[in-house]
Amino acid sequence: MGKIYGFYGGKFMPMHKGHLYCIDTAAKMCDHVTVIMFINGDDELEILKTHNEEMLSVESRIKQVERVCSLYPDMDFHIIDDNPLRGPDGKEDWDKETPLVRQYVPHMDYVFSSEPQYGAYFSRAYPEATHIIVDAERKTYPISSTMIRAMQILEDRKKWMV
């Protein structure tokens, strides 16, 4: 049997313990995992207007994800700027991102997320891969990046971050 390949992507805005749990799950199930961070200057500028924090900057997030990925010997990390791939309405167009993901992950056995609603897209974009949903109910780590950004107290946010 050949190597088992996995893929996990996100904005990691900010990187938190739920992301780490998903990455760790992928590393345990696969021989090699590719992690991709999607960045978009326009979206990020809007968020930074209301959350002027170093933890949300592109540079900070890249360092966080690189540090986590370096803990695993068979994991690589890439960045995709999806700003040029936006639709006319300015929204993300995952179908346009798929060929860029394929440049880094030409074959995958598993695609990891914590979002069941991503299943239809993953089935279409990566038909050879099984969608592994990690902690969808967020019982292990009851947190998301959106929830962290909504927290008013910095110490509350920091306890969830990596």
What are these regions (language model features)?
Residues M1-V162:
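Nucleotidyltransferase catalytic core that binds NTPs
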